Amino acid sequence: MPAKQTHSHRPIKSGKHGWLEKSTSGVPPSIQSALREAMRAESVSDADFNDLLWIMTQESAGIVNTHNGASRARGLFQLLRAQYGLNPNGEASFGDAKEECQGGIRYIYGRYHSAHAARSFWQHHHWY
């Protein structure tokens, strides 16, 4: 039975083979602080910090405005062009760690309704 398409703008794809989990300890303190600021701005519980940080680490290793040439994904949470509008200032938010985090938070809670659910999905599929 084929996998059910759950989100119209993201095609079903297989997980990454040979994937190794990245440690959150490599994310700079300034980026972790930006995540906490974004969580406050988006009224997200502090209890979700570790799950959000973990997702960010797997997606970008905490590198602001990072680009993925293969998918055109961008930023700390690797938003696709269709999600750029989730950032407070759209595409202009890239380069601002707090605003990139806000866009990622909005994507995660809009699609998965919790950071824990998004992390669980990521751990199973190696993408979100």
Predicted regions and their residues:
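Substrate-binding/active-site groove segments that recognize
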Residues: 69-88
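Secretory-pathway/luminal and periplasmic proteins that interact with or process carbohydrate-rich
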Residues: 60-67, 86, 127-128
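A short, structured beta-strand-centered segment in the mid-to-C-terminal lobe
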Residues: 90-99
